[in-house]
């Protein structure tokens, strides 16, 4: 059994089954996903987890950020919105999809139907993965379980790409990991309650943070519009990252302890870089306060 760090035990003394082990990957959707994929791959030297390819009604490619894969998705047909945005988080279930659905029902968590995706290999069809949409905040993004049927093989690809990133010294930015995915919700109390039901986790404070082993944490913050607001990425040295981004003209806001990649350079996404040795990621309120108080005079906006 996979066990989620921080799982609580039931009053009877028996531990109920863990439902989620980690953030398996997260993804962005863009009208120009392949161009962004190539930019992150070549400019930031992120190793390939899987090459950009068409899968029928969508196309995607994946790159590693150390402890998690980032998927670049291009959807075929009309989208409700244009541009680029972080759009979804895939959670790995502890067991298979059928067991996960049974546990979702037991916990009273609203969810969608099982959806199997079929791959064709050597003329033979096989189920590559099964997903289950979770009806939990934010409304502006998709949170879902993703059950890869060849999980060891998938994990091996992730691990090899992560090892390659480490061998490259994290690339020119010195990337080590994704520290946090920040989700904006209109009601932190409501959203936190639904995430707690899913994860058996009791976060504290005004901005609840849910932890997943060595993967990225998920932070919930109050926002007028629901969705995935930003990611916080750990780097070896903010000085090194600042110099690289300055040289390339892609440095955004730079304040004490953190820097931001210029959103226009990455499709409008907000990607915050913090030094890995720092004790924790800044809260969104702290980040906004620092940004207002100590804007770098050389920062392009």
PLM region descriptions:
Residues 1-5:
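Bacterial N-terminal signal peptides
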Residues 7-9:
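N-terminal Sec signal peptide cleavage junction
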Residues 11-34, 84-91, 147-190, 226-233, ...:
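N-terminal beta-strand motif that seeds the catalytic metal site of vicinal oxygen chelate
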Residues 18-20, 27-70, 112-126, 171-217, ...:
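Core segments of cupin and vicinal oxygen chelate
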Residues 72-113, 118:
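Hydrophobic/aromatic-rich structural module bridging two neighboring secondary-structure elements via a short loop
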Residues 74, 208, 219-223, 232-234:
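A structural feature that tracks compact, well-ordered secondary-structure segments
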Residues 101-174, 215-219, 239-301:
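Vicinal oxygen chelate
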Residues 224-227, 254:
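Alpha-helical subdomain
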């Amino acid at each position: 059994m996979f066990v989620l760090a921080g799982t609580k035990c039931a009053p009877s003394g028996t531990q109920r089954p863990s439902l989620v082990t980690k953030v398996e990957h997260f993804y962005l959707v863009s009208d120009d996903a392949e161009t962004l994929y190539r930019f992150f791959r070549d400019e930031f030297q992120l190793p390939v987890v899987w090459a950009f390819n068409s899968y029928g009604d969508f196309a995607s490619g994946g790159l590693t950020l150390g402890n998690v894969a980032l998927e670049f998705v291009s959807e075929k047909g009309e989208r409700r919105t244009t541009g680029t945005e972080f759009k979804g988080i895939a959670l790995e279930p502890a067991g298979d999809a059928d067991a996960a659905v049974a546990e979702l029902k037991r916990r009273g968590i609203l969810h969608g139907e099982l959806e199997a995706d079929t791959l064709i290999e050597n003329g033979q069809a096989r189920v590559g993965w099964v997903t289950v949409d979770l009806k939990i905040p934010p409304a502006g993004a998709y949170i879902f379980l993703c059950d890869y049927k060849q999980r060891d093989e998938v994990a091996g690809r992730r691990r090899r790409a992560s090892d390659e990133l480490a061998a490259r010294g994290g690339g020119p930015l010195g990337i080590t990991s994704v520290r946090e995915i920040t989700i904006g919700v209109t009601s932190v109390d409501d959203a936190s309650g639904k995430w707690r039901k899913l994860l058996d986790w009791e976060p504290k404070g005004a901005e609840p943070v849910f932890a997943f082993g060595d993967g990225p944490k998920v932070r919930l913050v109050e926002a007028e519009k629901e969705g995935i607001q930003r990611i916080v990425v750990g780097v070896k040295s903010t000085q090194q990252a600042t110099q690289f981004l300055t040289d390339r003209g892609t440095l955004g806001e730079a304040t004490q302890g953190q820097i931001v990649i210029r959103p226009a350079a990455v499709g409008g996404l907000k990607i915050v870089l913090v030094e890995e040795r720092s004790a924790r990621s800044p809260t969104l309120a702290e980040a906004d306060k620092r940004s207002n108080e100590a804007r770098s005079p050389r920062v392009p906006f």
